[in-house]
């Protein structure tokens, strides 16, 4: 485990991207018992607990308050619903988002936090070969930036951008780029057959 990786991390949402981050942390030596996942779907909770040994629970509670970092990993359209019961526990935490299109101002308004890092990892992150664009709000310290980068490092490369709007360009390139490569390779294989 990287010494800059946050010790206790809560994930709100337990889907594919949360699984990629959790898997990367556990594989790099992070203590699975220090990871808390709030996921309403029972099958997802059971999978994460079985696969990684994390604490997976159906709803937010005081265990989130013990985490210095929270990762918002829900579908963007479900963020407001997910944030409401979590806000009283996570306002003082460093908050990271892997939600496409949800701006830092929206996260701050819903969670009460100001230290927010927004990210846009791409699908190859699921196999540790991704690229994650990260943007940090001004309230995020250099140490917190390093902690955020350390959390994403096991999933691939980390690229910091200066403006939140720049994440859209990173998303267009890193998010769509692999799909075009896979499509191109598939077409080449079909042509060769």
Question: What function would you assign to each model-found segment?
Answer:
Residues 1-59, 193:
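NAD(P)+-binding Rossmann beta1-loop-alpha1 motif at the extreme N-terminus of oxidoreductases
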Residues 19, 23-27, 50, 84, ...:
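Short, well-ordered alpha-helices that flank and scaffold nucleotide-derived cofactor binding pockets
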Residues 20, 47, 81-82, 106, ...:
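Phosphate- and divalent-cation-binding pockets in alpha/beta enzyme and binding domains
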Residues 42, 52, 60-134, 138:
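Rossmann-like NAD(P)(H) cofactor-binding subdomain of soluble oxidoreductases
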Residues 106-115, 131-169, 182-193:
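Internal alpha-helical scaffold of NAD(P)-dependent oxidoreductase catalytic cores
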Residues 173:
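Catalytic, metal-anchored helix/loop core of enzyme active sites in primary metabolism
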Residues 177:
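Aromatic-residue-lined binding/catalytic grooves and analogous aromatic/hydrophobic interfacial grooves
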